[in-house]
């Protein structure tokens, strides 16, 4: 799994924060939370959401950058409790986390920037839900997974 957070601007509420977890094998966004503040609680809630959607394999590794939320004692304790190993990008090297960075770039190019501006937090939240759950996981094909959608790839992986 890979995880990161990105900024989304709204007219009324200013900067808001999207935290996501992606399964690198299927390209599926398996956990995401949207908040008005970038906190360790937001990334822990994202992890909880991912765990509702997918049971981690025995030797699961989650990769993140060195952001304070991901290096917090609370986040590390949660990962330890779940027996999930944590790997980190090198300082100042976003390429180490290219999978999730690529998802965020696609999200911004395909949804955020074309929309010009979201009126408020709620409007942004609805648009993100529609993009992630309605389009990205269900309809967006990826050449790296043989032109399947993330949901189709997940189904194949579960059958194997």
Task: Go through each PLM region and give its residues.
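Charged DNA-binding/catalytic regions of mobile-element recombinases
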Residues: 1-160
